[in-house]
Amino acid sequence: GGARLSDGELANGHFYGATLLSNISADMLIYREETFGPVAAVVPFDDDDDVIAMANDTRYGLAAYVYTQNLARALRTFEQLQFGIIGINDINPTSAAAPFGGMKESGLGREGAREGIEEYLETKLGGISI
């Protein structure tokens, strides 16, 4: 269930309070879709391979976040995740100087940085013999 906020700052519906969801199953939309809002779904897992498989089990792949103190685990997880942006112990791994974009159905190409402008350029090759 849920309830409509009726008082306080959030009563007018312009904001959504941070929400943590548990008891999530793979058939729920929150498990499969990209939710743009302050919502986090908590899903238990057995090991790294299990959680990586669950994370990649989606048509989308904009951003993923990993929290660990183990550098080897962080690098291994980074390599296996199918997301365009991955924050390791970082909630904001992007910058204006970095290429921004997702994988799968989260978009093609990149915005920003050199990779972003290259899609708008025409390359020419010329050869001259005199």
Where are these regions (language model features)?
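Short, solvent-exposed loop/turn elements at beta->coil junctions and helix N-caps
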Residues: 1-9
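Single, function-defining residue in the core of a domain
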Residues: 12
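Conserved C-terminal structural/oligomerization subdomain of aldehyde/semialdehyde dehydrogenase
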Residues: 15-130
